[in-house]
């Protein structure tokens, strides 16, 4: 049973970081592309668009950091191993 918990934890950590990483990268690319398009349409609003883009990128990156934190907890301080 202990081996299965370790194997599933490793697979879960790897898949979660990979999937969230791919989606976060795609979301950041879409946000940057939309911001560039918005600045091209309204150059006078560039400062406000840039500020909002930075907030959006920070929120997207926060999701990735939380996922990485959970994956590292699963790998190195797995709470499921103490219950077995």
Swiss-Prot record:
The keyword Cell membrane applies. Gene3D superfamilies: lithium bound rotor ring of v- atpase. InterPro entries: ATP_synth_F0_csu, ATP_synth_F0_csu_DDCD_BS, ATPase_proteolipid_c-like_dom, F/V-ATP_Csub_sf. It is found in: Cell inner membrane. CDD domains: ATP-synt_Fo_c (cd18121). F(1)F(0) ATP synthase produces ATP from ADP in the presence of a proton or sodium gradient. F-type ATPases consist of two structural domains, F(1) containing the extramembraneous catalytic core and F(0) containing the membrane proton channel, linked together by a central stalk and a peripheral stalk. During catalysis, ATP synthesis in the catalytic domain of F(1) is coupled via a rotary mechanism of the central stalk subunits to proton translocation. Key component of the F(0) channel; it plays a direct role in translocation across the membrane. A homomeric c-ring of between 10-14 subunits forms the central stalk rotor element with the F(1) delta and epsilon subunits. F-type ATPases have 2 components, F(1) - the catalytic core - and F(0) - the membrane proton channel. F(1) has five subunits: alpha(3), beta(3), gamma(1), delta(1), epsilon(1). F(0) has three main subunits: a(1), b(2) and c(10-14). The alpha and beta chains form an alternating ring which encloses part of the gamma chain. F(1) is attached to F(0) by a central stalk formed by the gamma and epsilon chains, while a peripheral stalk is formed by the delta and b chains. Belongs to the ATPase C chain family. This is ATP synthase subunit c. It comes from Dictyoglomus thermophilum (strain ATCC 35947 / DSM 3960 / H-6-12). The gene is atpE.
